[in-house]
Amino acid sequence: MSNYSIKQSAKNNYSSSSSGGFRGGHGGNEYFCGVGGEGDFGGMGGFGACGAGYGGGAGYGGGAGGAGYGGGAGGGGAGYGGGFGGGSGAGYGGGFGGGAGGGYGGGFGGGFGGGAGGMDIFSTNEKQTMQNLNDRLASYLDKVHALETANTELERKIKEWYEKQRPGSSSGDGAKDYSKYYTMINDLKNQIIAASIENAKFLLQNDNARLAADDFKMKFENEQYMRQTVEADINGLRRVMDDLTLSKSDLESQLESLSEELAYLKKNHEDELKGMQVTQVGQVNVEMNAAPSSDLTKILNDMRSQYEDLAKRNRAAAEEQFNRMSTDLKNTLSQGIEQQKESKSELTELKRTLQSLEIELQSQLAMKKSLEMTLAEVEGSFCMKLSRLQEMIVNVEEQIARLKGESECQTAEYQQLLDIKTRLENEIETYRRLLDGDLSKPKSGGGTSTNTGSTSSKGSTRTVKRREIIEEVVDGKVVSTKVVDM
């Protein structure tokens, strides 16, 4: 059976030689290599050793200067095949085998076609197609290798960057350690917070002092108003007292006039009594025997007693009237004073209530103003925070959109690379079929067989082996492959 192992050398690449082919042979990257034994598919060479094709020379397999598809140990040819067992092939279309000329068999002791002509089954277009496929495969592998190298480099740079950004890291490129600044930053933050708290305390004390000053000012104004009110009340009481003094003076003058009148009446009465007594003493007693007359003394005494009683009654009535009027006036004055005191106390209480209500109103207004200022500050801070959050949301959305775009691009690139990989796998499968000897186009659903031969000659000894490759193709796809040695 054919032995065509696919290897990769220690260099892990497929670099082209100076002649145009892939480097192989005795130590290069051997794509189809291995030391071919008797009847094997290949020889010592790989993907090219000294020519410009896939094999040695200009062929696909090639040996140490050979030119065949599998390559043997022949001389330097130039064909695509060059001989299954070696020889000196003669051109791309010169045969799949070797020998002295072209031909399909070549190495079976003259080749399948006798070694002098053979069947030209490959054309120049097929050679160019294979060369193009070879170039595309090499380009793809180079691109994959370059991408892997770039990816490794990017991973290394990302890792180094994360190592640099990690706190306390000390990389070889002189990364700085900022951990010592964190304590300073925290101390400064604490100082800023303490200063802010102290500033807030000072502002609060200032507001309290201003409110206290306003309260004292209001109290002073209220006390001043109360003082003016009390002074006005005192002036009113003074006027009332003056009126009462005038009334008292009038009453005293009336009392004096009444007393003088009483004294005058008494004096007149006494004078009349004295005059009557003198008249009675100096009269002449004339006695007549007549009817008894009334006693004048008794009459005068009766009159005097009547006048005295009348004077007493008048004096008592005047005193009673004076006392009653004085009592009424005193009661009225006392009631007025009591009402005035009650009114003053009620007014004072109302003023105190008004003052307390005004103070409470001022405090509530100040509290309302401070709360409004606090609310405005809180609304401003929250508006700023909301704007920052909205900016962060917009940035995150932009990053998400950018990442989505990058992901879509990477997905498209991945799909493209996957398609390229699929096409390359199909091309490699085509290469394998070509290596297996499937040189003719099989019919759909049927199996075909191709006879290949290999020959190796040493002196006069010739060994010939035949094998049959059977492939089952369904809808243009190879379903199964079978190799039968003849």
Curated annotation (Swiss-Prot):
Residues 277-299 are annotated as: Linker 12. SMART domains: Filament. Residues 439-486 are annotated as: Tail. Residues 300-438 are annotated as: Coil 2. The keyword Coiled coil applies. Residues 162-184 are annotated as: Linker 1. SUPFAM superfamilies: Intermediate filament protein, coiled coil region. Keywords: Coiled coil, Intermediate filament, Keratin. Residues 185-276 are annotated as: Coil 1B. Pfam families: Filament. It comes from the Eukaryota. Residues 1-125 are annotated as: Head. There are two types of cytoskeletal and microfibrillar keratin: I (acidic; 40-55 kDa) and II (neutral to basic; 56-70 kDa). Heterotetramer of two type I and two type II keratins. This is Keratin-3, type I cytoskeletal 51 kDa. It comes from Xenopus laevis (African clawed frog). The lineage of its organism: Eukaryota, Metazoa, Chordata, Craniata, Vertebrata.
